[in-house]
Curated annotation (Swiss-Prot):
GO biological process: cysteinyl-tRNA aminoacylation
Motif interval(s): 'KMSKS' region: 274-278
Lineage summary: Bacteria, Pseudomonadati, Pseudomonadota, Alphaproteobacteria, Rickettsiales
Organism: Orientia tsutsugamushi (strain Ikeda)
Subcellular location(s) per record: Cytoplasm
The protein, known as: Cysteine--tRNA ligase
Domain of life: Bacteria
EC identifiers of the protein: 6.1.1.16
PANTHER family listed in its UniProt record: CYSTEINE--TRNA LIGASE, CYTOPLASMIC, CYSTEINYL-TRNA SYNTHETASE
Enzyme class per UniProt: ligase
Length: 478
């Protein structure tokens, strides 16, 4: 089986061939943790979670290194902390926890590594120093360090923009200390009135903080090396963020290609406009959680449109996804005695024409709409079958395919939620939040807190099962 993926660098769909035939390295730009994620942010996470699942199918999860960073130092973070009158550390720590809770609600796997920018300042300083030494960057008297764009001849290779068009759209041309209007910042000096120690770091150019672009170059290099297979992110990151990443990384490591495949997902729109906090047209993941909407339905809504196309959020698209999830769950429930063991499901995949068609769709540039159509066809065939053995085999195929899409992470939600309401002191939403906090506690190696949360839920009749992919499922103990 071969995966074909659209490479923004070549503007073509290409057969994916990793640097190492037995392993894959993937870097995805993660959240800037100044506020809770809206569903436009979440769509990107779900897209690369699906890619991670497909790569795991092909190469084995143990052979995938999936790095997704946390940007925990940024102008937006500094301004938000001042607005709330709290420390930067408190803001970023609490927002990171909420991000993990929201992604758990959507059934997303944990990345292999999730580095924070502030933990890797030394790597950034080393790369900036190297760029200055090679003449690719320069420092100014006021403590700024800029990358000299004209020193990298392939600067526009990814974005395919012209410098003339960049001049017309430039926001930074008013900075007189820059040698060229397109030069971008690698290091910013600390503001004289900035008293938050979390925003100030020592450097050879004085106290300050890194620019946004250098953060991802440093973390991808530290955890994946000079060359890696896939770099992912939203289409809005093609320019300037990913364009600048390529420039500084390839100049810092002249023999490297940086990332081989550049993958970008489309915007999530509202009435044709990109969803963003600046336009105040956003819906947060928590807004949907508060409506007690199944996270699997939200995830399915994202996957119902091809990842490279814009997705317009509206009530109809969400209701359609909710109806499909209910249809799939009802289909599974209609088959008595279905074996849900993973081994049986995998064995069924090997010889099942329906699952072969489903997998083929995902291998064709993550064609999730076609994969969902295959899924519904399997469900339709289950309802038509009279023989219990045929129903069982098809249901195993349905379970396998649904698990690969990530829409069965809370299969028990509908049935168990009614039991929870009747027999427990916690709601399904509260259970999901506690599970996310427990996952965070385990990542922080706070084993006592993790055990306390498990015991708390158990005392309320909720049993937890930790899965190999880092997610946790729950069910009501009858």
């Amino acid at each position: 089986m071969n995966l074909y993926i659209y490479n923004t660098l070549s503007r073509k769909k290409e057969r994916f061939v990793p640097l190492n035939c037995k392993s894959v390295k993937m870097y995805v730009c993660g959240p800037t943790v100044y506020d809770i994620p809206h569903i436009g942010n979440a769509r990107s996470v779900v897209v690369y979670d699906l890619l991670y699942r497909v790569l795991s199918l092909l190469y084995g999860r143990q052979n995938i290194t999936y790095v997704r960073n946390i940007t925990d130092i940024d102008d937006k973070i500094i301004n938000r902390a001042k607005e709330l009158k709290i420390s930067i550390f408190k803001l970023t720590h609490e927002t990171t926890i909420k991000f993990h809770e929201d992604m758990s609600y959507l059934g997303c796997c944990n990345p292999t590594i999730e580095p924070k920018a502030t933990d890797n300042i030394d790597v950034m300083i080393n790369i900036i120093t190297s760029l200055i030494q090679t003449g690719n960057a320069y420092s100014t008297d006021d403590g700024h360090v800029y990358f000299a764009v004209k020193t990298f001849q392939d600067y526009n290779l990814l974005s395919r923009r012209t410098f003339d068009s960049m001049i017309l759209n430039s926001r930074e041309s008013s900075e007189p200390q820059k040698s060229y209007f397109a030069d971008f910042v690698l290091w910013k000096p600390a503001n004289a009135d900035n008293e938050d120690i979390d925003a100030v770091f020592d450097s050879p150019w004085g106290k300050g903080r890194p620019g946004w672009h250098i953060e991802c170059s440093a973390m991808s290099y530290k955890f994946l090396g000079e060359n890696f297979d896939i770099h992912g992110g939203g289409a809005d990151l093609i320019f300037p963020h990913h364009t600048n990443e390529i420039a500084q990384s390839r100049c810092a490591f002249p023999e490297s290609r940086h990332a081989l495949y550049w993958v970008h997902n489309g915007f999530l729109t509202v009435k044709g406009e990109k969803m963003s906090k600046s336009l105040n047209n956003f819906v947060t993941v928590r807004d949907l959680q508060k409506q007690n909407i199944n996270g699997a339905a939200v995830r399915l809504m994202f996957l119902s449109t091809h990842y490279r196309k814009p997705l317009d959020f509206n009530d109809k698209s969400l209701n359609d996804a909710k109806n499909i999830i209910n249809y799939l769950y009802d289909t599974i429930d209609s088959v008595n005695g279905t074996a849900q063991q993973q081994d049986n499901i995998k064995a069924e995949f090997k010889g099942n024409a329906f699952t072969v068609e489903f997998i083929s769709a995902l291998l064709d540039d993550l064609n999730s709409p076609k994969a969902i159509a295959c899924l519904l066809n399997i469900a339709k065939q289950i309802r038509r079958q009279n023989q219990s053995e045929d129903k069982l085999a098809l249901t195993q195929a349905l379970l396998y395919a649904s698990n690969l899409l990530g829409i069965l992470h809370n299969y028990q939600f509908i049935k168990d939620s009614n039991d929870v309401k009747d027999n427990s002191n916690v709601t399904p939403h509260e259970i999901d939040l506690l599970i996310a906090k427990r996952i965070q506690a385990k990542q922080d190696k706070d084993w006592n807190l993790a055990d306390q949360i498990r015991s708390q839920l158990l005392s309320n009749g909720i049993s937890l099962t930790d899965k190999a992919d880092g997610t946790t499922s729950w069910k009501v103990i009858k």
